[in-house]
Every structure is written in structure tokens, then in C-alpha cells.
Amino acid sequence: MKNSIIFLLSLLYIQTFAQVKSSDTQTIIEKEKNAFVQKMNVGNINPNTLNYDLRYQRMDLTVNPSVYHVSGSVTSHFIPNQSISSIYFDLTPQLTVSQVSYHGNSLNFQQLPSNEVKVDFTAALPSSTLDSLTIHYSGAPAVGYNAFSVDTQNSTAILSTLSEPYGAQDWFPTKQSLNDKIERFDIKITAPAQYNVASNGTLMSETLLPGSQKLTFWRTQYPMAAYLAAIAITNYTKLNDVIGSPPFPFVNYIYPSTAADPAAMANIEWTKQAMTTFETYFGAYPFRNEKYGHMQFQFGGGMEHQTMSSMGGFTKQLIAHELAHQWFGDKVTCGAWNDIWLNEGFATFGEHLVNEKLIMTNTQFMNYLIGQKNFITSSPGGSVYVADANLASVNTIFNGRLSYAKGG
């Protein structure tokens, strides 16, 4: 009888554990699905941006987490791959361009209803020659897409961005191509001095300005797809630590309430174990010269912004999923959204890996895998590749059975 009770309790534990894991996975999927669904009217590639290579961008923006507005400029360095007399950038019309500067002069431009800015040069630019221009703009970004959001956390204002897949154009002019990563990105944000600004790469400086403002300068020198650029701003507690072997910076910008939560802090510390495991099996963390870390934001789930994941919470599964994306999704990025299983499948595999090595017993893990297999085979057919005809179906792209479970 005693053994029977223990066996039944074990089954109950495994079932409960599996339900928790399933709930966590569904939260991750719903986050990514909701981010994508608002922007499905855009295709994989804007053909008007294929005639140049975007090499560098510098954003100089002024924002306030209490105000739904952005103003400033973005400087872009590019190399035409053919002679061009005009250049296009992705930018939604809710943002108003006031000027395009080019070597001290102003250029003519048009804002098009196709979410583009067309800039006309006074003379054709030659192929294979580095050039640059600056777009000055301002406005209230498109509402409802979560690409640019202001809200509150614990009664304090917070601003965050979440650009996957096509939301970068909602808050800055860029080239939204998965095949043309931006080699270097400088992110300069002016905001009220009481807030801390989190972003990609290395923190270069924080400078107090007149009028109780602060300029925060982040720089990343690793190639990055436009949708992986992000900022988040609130009264963060900043935690500077190290991770990995040999160690590199582990930087967390979290709410003060999270810093006072022992369970959340223990899981953030657990990230170090996940990093060691992933480096053992995936190879060196791909952005070691800068950092890894988390910036907390007001949405459920998370987002694998390069070098600094945005996190709605700190469960171990979510931490592992977003960390695995740094290898698969950020360093190695699918060339088209048809192949999103390459991002999500490998991130799901990362969850499996920490379940096996760090979280579960052998029995728990085998039962977990059986559950995954049963889920994958619960319906007939299904390809991890999303055909062009299904790119308008967010439920097909973010299919938990195929893109996540079967992909993993």
C-alpha cells in the first residue's frame, strides 16, 4: 500500500509538473503570437530596400515613460549594391519626418502610405561606396501593436519596445530585413533623470543634462536584425554581475519589487547554471564581449532582444527559452518567417536541455518527453515550415505543436 501511494503521488507530481511546464510554454507562445498578429500585413522582404546594405545606425531619441511620444533622429550608414538615385527606409506614417540631412544639406523625401520613407539624392550614388544620412522625426507611434508602449509598473511609469517581427518601423526608420543585419548600432536615449534606460550591448555612458534629464548611451558591435533592437525605461534596480567561464558581464535591470522577491532573485541567479549548460552544448555565448542580461517589462512572456532579453517574469523555463534564443534567433537568424521553427524549435530544445540537466530527475524527464511526443503526434501531418500561403495565419506560424514542440 505504501509503495502504491508513493507511485500515485509521483504520477500526480509529474502531471502537475507537466501542467506547469505546459502553462509556461503557452505563455511564451501567446506572447510571440500576439506580437506577430498585429503586423501580419507586412511581407518578409521590402523589395525597395534590397539595393543597399545597412551597415550602421545611431538613434538619438528623446522619450518620457509617462508620455506616448518619441522625437529625435536616426543616422544610417549604408553601401549601395548598385547605382541609386533614391533610398527607402521602413517607417510608419504615424511618425512625421521633418528633415533628411545629407552631408550638411537637406534632401527631398516622401512619406509613403506603404510604411516607407523615400529619400531622393541630388545625384546618383555609386555602387559599393559607404555613405550616410540622418532622418529627423517625431510623433506618437502606431497604437495597439506593442512595438512602442508606455504603461505603469507598481505605480511607476515604464516605456518599452517589442519589435518582433515588423515593429521596428513603428518607432525608428530602419531596414526590416532578416538577411541584412546592422553591423553596429549606437543607441542614445534622453529621458527624465530619475529613470534608468536598458538596451542592447555595452553601456558606454550616462550623462546628466540640464532640466533633470539624463542621456544614456548603449553600443552593440555585433550584427543585429532590426527587430532585436530594444529599449526599456523605468525606475530599474541595476544589478551588475558576471556569468560564464571565463566570466563576462551579467546585467539585470529589474523592478525594485523584483529585487525584493527571493524566488525571482534565485531564478535570476540560476541563469548562470543555464548559461554554463548552454555553453557546454551550444558553444561559447555569442555576445561575450558585451553582456547577457534581462530588462523587465510589462508584458507576459519574454522577448530575446540581443544581449538583453525583455522579461515579463522569471520562471526557469522562460529564462532558458530566451537565453537559448541568443544562439538560435539572434546569432543565427531565420532568413524568412517561413522558417521561424529554427528560432522557436531550438529555443524549445534549450528548455528540454535544462529540464534534463538541471531541473528534472531522469524519470520526470522521460515522462516529460513522452508528453511532448504525444502532443506532437496528437494530430496527423503538419510541417515545421510555414508555406507562403499560410504567412497570414498567426496560428500556423506560432503553432505550439509544430514550430515549438516538433521543432524542438
What is the role of each PLM region?
Residues P47, H136-F185:
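Glycine/proline-rich low-complexity spacer/linker segments in large multi-domain proteins
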Residues V67-P93:
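Ligand-binding face of N-terminal immunoglobulin V-set domains in extracellular IgSF glycoproteins
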Residues A18-S71, Q153, A157-S160:
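N-terminal, polar/Ser/Thr-rich
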Residues M1-Q26:
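Bacterial Sec-dependent N-terminal signal peptides
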Residues G72, S163-E164, Q176-A320, F349:
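Hydrophobic helix-coil surface modules that form long, contiguous segments used
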Residues V20-K21, I28, I87, T92-N154:
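A surface-exposed beta-strand-loop module
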Residues E344, T348-G408:
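Acidic/His/Gly-enriched intrinsically disordered linker/tail segments
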Residues M308-I370:
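Zinc-dependent metallopeptidase catalytic helix centered on the HExxH motif
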